[in-house]
Amino acid sequence: MEGHVYWTDDEVWAIRRAYLDGSGAQTLINTKINDPDDIAVNWVARSLYWTHTGTEHIEVTCLNSTSHKILVSEDMDEPRAIALHPEMGLTYWIDWGENPEIKRANLDRQELRVLVNASLGWPNGLALDLQEGKLYWGDAKTDKIEAISVDETKRQTLLKDKLPHIFRFTLLGDFIYWTAWQHHSIKRVHKVKANRDVIIDQLPDLMGLKAVNVDKVVGTNPHADRNGGAATCASSRPTQPGLAAPSRAWNC
């Protein structure tokens, strides 16, 4: 987003960013960040979402702001991977625990629901295919890569063997990429043909992974024209307990 790459720093409990060439590194958020796990950028509203495994929250901030607020706080065990659908106004995330689940809510904190809660082990990676209308995830315990249609009508298995400990997960074009802890490598699989190969090998301590097309940005912000061209991070009244309380919008 705007020539930056964003990441969580678990050692200092902060969210940071830098330019794509590595210069200009800076800290965005470093207050009340307890074990940040995964992040996702809303390129339409210019906002940043992240999961807290320490506080069991999902939070959000504007990209030009150091203030942040809680998006979801209840019925959370151990939030991990997160993915956004800005055009549909949806956020998806994985919740670990004794009964792992994949959940969804509106970006304005409403309509929290469970999408998948059966036959999950250690779901780690999460990737949203906007063109095909599918949500993919990798499971480090069942050694599978699976998908569910965003309308929740069909669940399918893409791969189910020789996938030890999938960690992070991303999608670009026709390929899903993931970090393989035990193999110290980055691998990919074709989302239709299911043929796979190794991209990079012999890289220990692999963690996060994100692939993006910087030349292709999809979606517009309906609030921008009413705000002099600036996007707005808007809040609205929740319909369920545990979602953020209504408050005044702030500009990104």
UniProtKB/Swiss-Prot annotation:
It holds the Pfam family Ldl_recept_b. LDL-receptor class B repeats lie at residues 3-45, 46-88, 89-132, 133-175, 176-218. Residues 223-247 are annotated as: Disordered. PROSITE patterns: LDLRB (PS51120). SMART domains: LY. InterPro entries: 6-blade_b-propeller_TolB-like, Cueball_EGF_LRP_Nidogen, LDLR_classB_rpt. Keywords: Repeat. Transmembrane segments: none annotated. It comes from the Eukaryota. This is Low-density lipoprotein receptor-related protein 5-like protein.
